[in-house]
Amino acid sequence: MPLATFSISEALQLGQFVLAAYDLFTAGDPAVFTPPGGYTLVTKIYADDITDGVPDYKVFGFIARSGPDVIVAIRGTEGVFEWIMDFLFIPVLFPYVNAGRTERGFTNFYSSFHTGADSSTPRVVDALRTLTAGGTVQTLEIAGHSLGSALATLLAIDVAGNGVFASPTVYTFASPRVGDKVFAGTYDGLVPNTWRVANLNDIVTYLPPPFAGYVHVDSEVPINSDDRTKHTISCWHQLRTYLNTLDSSVALDADCVPA
């Protein structure tokens, strides 16, 4: 059971950080990047999104800090190769924590999670280990959307299961199922302060299918965007749709505004 409670204001703040991760990517990964909310950039996050063995690291998010508070923001899927990997549905043993099996595409993405655009740079979990080693970090929040939600989930269990930070807080939007029953149970025990915001119309939240052995982690926060946005698969999945459903002052994507 969660040790804390779901906070709309916290969800909205973290959602803005994930939107900033998208902006970082669409802007072409500029050398100068300032996180929102007065936070300072610690490092960007990169991952290899190519399945054929050819290195092609792209920026997926960032780690930011403000005093004792650290936020990790991870964007969702962009591009055909990422979508292909999203939906392989092949389970593999999760290599970083004894926690059952996870979907292969998500696991491969996570295995390439580094702080630079090649595999010689530190892994993201190791960067967090260094950041938290001095004992000055009091809160660690991890947030993601779509594929970024799966990656946030894997990062959180790696962090908690390997003694990097005992009690990360996780907010995900439009998360797919990440692993099997053993994984979900282990995750829920290690990372109880997790809130998985799920739009009832978003197909991604129903994948990979349970008949393939996949189980969602806790704790679901259901929302319904029926009266908010155009009724399309894309609009139901957009991060701005999620945030607008939580708070109507957040603008929808222009293509999703109802006529």
What are these regions (language model features)?
Residues 1-66:
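N-terminal low-complexity, Ser/Thr- and acidic-residue-enriched intrinsically disordered segments
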Residues 23, 69, 76-80, 176-179, ...:
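Short loop/turn segments at secondary-structure transitions that flank enzyme active sites
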Residues 144-148, 152:
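Gly/Ala-rich beta-loop-alpha elbow adjacent to hydrolase catalytic centers
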